[in-house]
Each structure stands twice: as structure tokens, then as C-alpha cells.
């Protein structure tokens, strides 16, 4: 039987990295699929650790945060959501357009984690969520979408994912769905054996959809995140935490180990979890003639804190490393 070598992947190869940070190559959209206990959280921790030196800010949307508190102390409470809404993506989009224009590619990066809250497939039909998949690389965003089970993404959205981490799946039905949604680059008859071989001892399979190659094994890698009992270090620049803690009363972390990032951060533009989210009549997103709350609805006035009516705040935070 022919043996096919599966190479180990390096998180440092994922954009942004030291090679791409000064360029317009743009961001990466990653999907992580694994059941509880598979090693999914350890992988997410490793992803955060690998990018903390070049990404100054993060927004987390986690449907399980109230139960497990995984991101507590990793990202400020101000920027942790417990429920997904397309309006969060809309505000991230507007913030990133302004941040990239004001600060350039190097200083405008944002990490967005959407963890265990994508069970409603209809959410992916919203125009802003689709824009994140289609054009998110131009927003300078690293997107990590983690879920326990395969999501029913439409084919055009699946084709927009840059990379997929797959943990071991023993259920044949779910394994077949995983293959159909994300892993069809591997010959179908080989897929069960490849998954069984690669995904042992908390390893996972990584499929790189950005590779232009005729050989499937050039796009398939294995990865095992290093396990550590220590808490995840705070993610983001000091001023990012300082701003958030000043609004919530959360205690500032004692240690920051990220590389110093210079320049302005449009912190006021980040969507804050403490603010009320826009709902659209119980729908998953706005209709063609619904842009958000009317002037008669509750919300911040022009003089109050938050986004102004045109979605642009004049607040800038610049003292990054006091």
C-alpha cells in the first residue's frame, strides 16, 4: 500500500504573520470543528498565543462563555458577546474600513472569534455575514469560527473559507458531513483512514484551501496544539485593555507579553458587548429597507457615547503603552 506523508502545519504560516503584516494580502478565515474534549479549546488557545504579538484587538462571540468562562481574562469583558447577531459583524465591518484607512494594514488588525454559537444556519444568509466570508480578507480580520458540529454552509461560503481544523469524528454520519462540507480535497475512499491516522492523541487535520496544487496531500496537514495548564495570557495591546477596563471596572491584567504596537487604535469603533444590539423585527438581519433603529427608537444620541448615526465616532485612543 502506498504511503502518503502528511506534513505538520505551523500556525505562523497563517495570515497575519511577520511576512504579510505590512502587505495588503489581507486576513484569514478559519473554521475549527471538534466535539467537547477533542482538543478544540487547546487549539484556540494556541491560535491566540501565536497571533498576540501582531494583533492589538479582539472581539469574541461565544455561546458557551456563560457556562465555561473560557475567554474571561483573555479578552476584556467589554468585547465578549454571549449571543451572535449580524449587527456585530456590521459594526466590525465599518470599524475595519475606517481603521485600515486611518492606520494602514499593519496597525488595523482585528481578531474575531465566533465560538459555539452558529447552530442557526440562517444567520449565514445575512448580507453582512456573507460579506465577511466573501470580502473579509480585505477588512484585515483574522476570523476563527469554532463549532462542535458541521455547519450547513452554502457551497459559495464554504469555498470562501481559507482553512479548516478537523478533530477526530467517530460518528459516520457526522464524518460524512464533515467530508462533504470541508474535506472533499481528500479522495473519498481515503478520507476515513486519513482522519483515523492523523487525528489521534488530540491531533487534528488542517486543510489549507489557499493552496494551488493538483496533489491533495500538499493541502492536508496535521497539527497538535501544545497543552498547558497555565491560564491563557491576556490578548491585545495595553491600551485596548485600559480602555475596556475604564468602562467596565474590570481589573487590568498584571502582565502583557505582546510586542509593542505603535499608532492609534480605533477602540471606540469596536462593538461593545455592553451596548444593546439592534434587532430587526425578529428576523435574522435587516430587510432591504431596514438599516437599523429609527430616530424614535432608543439608542445613543449624537452626544452620547457609542457610534454616531453615520457609524463613525471621533474618539481615538493613542497612548498604547503607558
Curated annotation (Swiss-Prot):
Compositionally biased intervals (Acidic residues) = 287-305
Q: Which residues cross the membrane?
A: none
One matching Pfam family, short form?
Pox_A32
Q: Which InterPro entries match?
A: A32L, P-loop_NTPase
Q: Where is this region: Disordered?
A: 277-322
Designated name of the protein: Uncharacterized protein 015R
Amino acid at each position: 500500500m502506498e504511503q502518503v506523508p502528511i506534513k505538520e502545519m505551523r500556525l505562523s504560516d497563517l495570515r497575519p504573520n511577520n511576512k504579510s503584516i505590512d502587505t495588503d494580502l489581507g486576513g484569514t478565515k478559519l473554521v475549527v470543528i471538534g466535539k467537547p474534549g477533542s482538543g478544540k479549546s487547546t487549539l484556540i488557545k494556541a491560535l491566540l498565543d501565536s497571533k498576540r504579538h501582531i494583533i492589538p484587538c479582539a472581539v469574541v462571540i461565544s455561546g458557551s462563555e456563560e457556562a465555561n468562562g473560557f475567554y474571561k481574562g483573555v479578552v476584556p469583558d467589554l468585547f465578549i458577546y454571549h449571543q451572535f447577531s449580524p449587527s456585530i459583524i456590521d459594526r466590525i465591518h465599518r470599524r475595519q474600513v475606517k481603521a485600515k484607512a486611518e492606520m494602514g494594514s499593519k496597525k488595523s488588525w482585528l481578531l474575531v472569534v465566533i465560538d459555539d454559537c452558529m447552530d442557526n444556519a440562517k444567520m449565514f444568509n445575512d448580507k453582512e455575514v456573507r460579506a465577511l466570508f466573501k470580502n473579509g480578507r480585505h477588512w484585515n480580520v483574522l476570523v476563527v469560527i469554532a463549532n462542535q458540529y458541521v455547519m450547513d454552509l452554502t457551497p459559495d461560503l464554504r469555498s470562501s473559507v481559507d482553512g479548516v481544523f478537523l478533530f477526530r469524528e467517530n460518528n459516520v454520519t457526522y464524518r460524512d458531513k464533515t467530508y462533504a462540507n470541508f474535506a472533499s480535497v481528500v479522495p473519498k475512499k481515503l478520507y476515513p483512514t486519513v482522519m483515523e491516522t492523523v487525528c489521534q492523541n488530540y491531533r487534528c487535520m488542517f486543510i489549507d484551501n489557499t493552496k494551488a496544487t493538483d496533489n491533495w496531500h500538499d493541502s492536508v496537514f496535521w497539527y497538535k496544539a501544545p497543552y498547558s495548564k497555565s491560564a491563557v495570557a491576556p490578548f491585545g495591546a495595553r491600551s485596548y485593555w485600559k480602555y475596556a477596563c475604564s468602562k467596565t471596572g474590570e481589573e487590568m491584567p498584571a502582565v502583557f507579553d505582546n510586542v509593542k504596537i505603535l499608532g492609534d487604535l480605533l477602540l471606540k469603533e469596536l462593538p461593545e458587548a455592553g451596548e444593546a444590539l439592534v434587532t430587526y423585527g425578529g428576523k435574522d438581519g435587516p430587510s432591504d429597507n431596514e438599516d437599523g433603529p429609527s430616530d424614535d427608537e432608543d439608542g445613543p444620541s449624537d452626544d452620547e457615547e457609542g457610534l454616531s448615526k453615520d457609524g463613525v465616532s471621533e474618539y481615538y485612543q493613542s497612548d498604547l503603552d503607558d
